């Protein structure tokens, strides 16, 4: 089976639609990338996992649409201030584009999301009951703060941190994540509260170290970005409970990120 690829622009998103060479009214999938600015192939260090998956699916009779993230590669828009809700809107536009194509079976359109893309898939499928299926690859099923706490623990222990040391650190990390759950405060107010929490145990000498303070400020700025705040507060499990379509969730046993 061959395949036919075509470039298109959906609102401000640039992407590629691959179609099987023979037949019509194909089932189709929209592929959604993970966190960070990703191109349509989700390219990293020379690897193009979305290209590989799209190629395999198309050769097996499934049409695939994948796009560069907003503000990335050939897509327009701003990535830095976008949240997963914004990316869900982009994904909805991709689904609607597929429905407009005569080659696609509009009743058999699903979403494949990788990492944070799995979260986005759940958001879209909850809003749109006609989504045929969802595949979550290394996605999340719990609220962001719980996920991040477990992730930090697994990564720290994989690097040799004794459990006793981790148990000593855990309350401080959990408290900082709890600060981010305060939806009645502005990002600037959260930054001040986080800064006070992080620096309360630092010595006067450490507080005078410009490099240390700059690193802390950069980390706090990242933690209070629109995307991170939405991620930490959102519980995909609540949306997952409401889905009526089939869901396939795949997670690697050794994947600790």
Task: Tell me the role of every PLM-derived stretch.
Residues 25-35:
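Short beta-strand element of the alpha/beta-hydrolase
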Residues 243, 249-251:
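Short beta-strand/loop motif that positions the catalytic acidic residue
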Residues 103-115:
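Alpha/beta-hydrolase fold nucleophile elbow
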Residues 81-102:
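Alpha/beta-hydrolase active-site loop
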Residues 1-5, 10:
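Single conserved hydrophobic/aromatic residue that forms the stacking wall/gate
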Residues 137-241:
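Accessory cap/linker subdomain of secreted extracellular hydrolases
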Residues 39-52, 69:
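The serine-hydrolase catalytic nucleophile loop
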Residues 52-74:
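Conserved alpha/beta-hydrolase
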């Amino acid at each position: 089976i061959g395949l036919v690829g075509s470039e298109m622009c959906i609102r401000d998103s640039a992407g590629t639609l691959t179609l099987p060479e023979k037949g019509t009214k194909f089932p189709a999938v929209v592929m959604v990338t993970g966190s960070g600015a990703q191109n349509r192939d989700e390219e990293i260090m020379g690897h193009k996992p979305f290209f590989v998956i799209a190629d395999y699916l198309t050769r097996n009779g499934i049409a695939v649409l994948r796009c560069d993230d907003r503000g990335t590669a050939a897509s327009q828009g701003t990535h830095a201030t976008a949240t997963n809700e914004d990316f869900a809107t982009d994904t909805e536009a991709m689904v609607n584009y597929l429905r407009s194509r005569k080659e696609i079976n509009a009743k058999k359109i699903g979403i494949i999301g990788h990492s944070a893309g799995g979260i986005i898939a759940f958001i879209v499928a909850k809003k749109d009951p006609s989504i045929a299926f969802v595949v979550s690859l290394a996605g999340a099923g719990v609220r962001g703060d719980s996920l991040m706490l477990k992730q930090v623990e697994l990564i720290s222990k994989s690097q040799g941190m004794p459990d006793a040391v981790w148990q000593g650190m855990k309350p401080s990390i959990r408290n900082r994540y709890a600060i981010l759950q305060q939806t009645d405060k502005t990002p600037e107010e959260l930054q001040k509260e986080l800064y006070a929490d992080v620096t309360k145990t630092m010595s006067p000498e450490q507080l005078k170290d410009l490099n240390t303070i700059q690193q802390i400020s950069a980390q706090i700025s990242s933690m209070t970005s629109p995307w991170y705040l939405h991620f930490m507060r959102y519980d995909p499990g609540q949306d997952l409970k409401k889905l009526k379509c089939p869901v396939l969730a795949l997670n690697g046993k050794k994947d600790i990120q």
